[in-house]
C-alpha cells in the first residue's frame, strides 16, 4: 500500500458494462450490472485503491445503511492495493456503519486490499479457494528538502504502527508477529489466510 495519494481513475469505469433488463408492472427497466447487484447489497472493490474508487465505495456503504441498517452488506474484493488514505476512508466507514460488512476475496486481496478484507465483520470474512492474499508494510517515496523528507518518514512510520496494530486486532496475531510478517511482501494461499486469521473461511460453493 502506498502512503502517497493516487488519483488514477479505475479501469472498470472505462470498460463496457453489461446491462440487465427487468420486467416490472410499469414495463421494462434496465440497470447496469453493478447497480443491479447493489440492489442485492453487493459492492465491488476492484482494481487499485485510490480516492475516486474509495469515494464510490463509501457512498454505496452509506446508501445501503440508509436503505436497511439491519441487513448485511457484501463487499467483494479483487485488488492489488493502493493508497493508505483512500483505503482508510473505506475501512473507517465499514466500522462506522450499523450493518455488518461481509468481505469476500476473489482473485487477490493485496496490501490495502488485504487490510480491508481482514476488516470485515468477525465470522463473515471469506476467500475463494484459488485467491491469494498479501500483506506488507506501507510504501513511500519522497523528494524535497531533508527536513520535509524526515517529516514524511516519521509519518509513514506512524501509519505503519497504526496499520499493524489494527491488523493484529483483526487477525488475533501478536503485534510482534504482524510487524515481522509485514516487513516484506508476504503472500498467502486461501487456506493460509484462514490460518493466519485474515479471513474466517474458504468459500468453495454457495450453501
UniProtKB/Swiss-Prot annotation:
GO terms for molecular function: ATP-dependent peptidase activity; ATPase binding; serine-type endopeptidase activity. It holds the Pfam family CLP_protease. It is found in: Cytoplasm. InterPro entries: ClpP, ClpP/crotonase-like_dom_sf, ClpP/TepA, ClpP_His_AS, ClpP_Ser_AS. One of its GO terms (cellular component) is cytoplasm. One of its GO terms (biological process) is protein quality control for misfolded or incompletely synthesized proteins. SUPFAM superfamilies: ClpP/crotonase. PROSITE patterns: CLP_PROTEASE_HIS, CLP_PROTEASE_SER. The keyword Iron does not apply. HAMAP family: ClpP. Belongs to the peptidase S14 family. Fourteen ClpP subunits assemble into 2 heptameric rings which stack back to back to give a disk-like structure with a central cavity, resembling the structure of eukaryotic proteasomes. This is ATP-dependent Clp protease proteolytic subunit. The gene is clpP.
Amino acid at each position: 500500500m502506498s502512503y502517497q495519494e493516487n488519483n488514477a481513475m479505475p479501469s472498470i469505469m472505462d470498460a463496457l458494462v453489461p446491462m440487465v433488463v427487468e420486467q416490472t408492472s410499469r414495463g421494462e427497466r434496465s440497470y447496469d450490472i453493478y447497480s443491479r447487484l447493489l440492489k442485492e447489497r453487493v459492492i465491488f472493490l476492484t482494481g487499485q485503491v485510490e480516492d475516486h474508487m474509495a469515494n464510490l465505495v463509501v457512498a454505496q456503504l452509506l446508501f445501503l445503511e440508509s436503505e436497511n441498517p439491519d441487513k448485511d452488506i457484501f463487499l467483494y474484493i479483487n485488488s492489488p492495493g493502493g493508497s493508505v488514505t483512500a483505503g482508510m476512508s473505506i475501512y473507517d466507514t465499514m466500522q462506522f456503519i450499523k450493518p455488518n460488512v461481509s468481505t469476500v476475496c476473489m482473485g487477490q486481496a493485496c496490501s490495502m486490499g488485504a487490510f480491508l478484507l481482514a476488516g470485515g465483520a468477525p465470522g463473515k470474512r471469506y476467500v475463494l479457494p484459488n485467491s491469494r492474499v498479501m500483506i506488507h508494510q506501507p510504501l513511500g517515496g519522497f523528494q524535497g528538502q531533508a527536513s520535509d523528507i524526515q517529516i514524511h518518514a516519521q509519518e509513514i512510520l506512524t501509519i505503519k504502527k497504526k496499520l499493524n496494530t489494527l491488523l493484529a486486532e483483526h487477525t488475533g496475531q501478536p503485534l510482534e508477529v504482524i510487524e515481522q510478517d509485514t516487513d516484506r511482501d508476504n503472500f498467502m494461499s486461501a487456506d493460509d489466510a484462514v490460518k493466519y486469521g485474515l479471513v474466517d473461511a474458504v468459500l468453495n460453493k454457495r450453501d
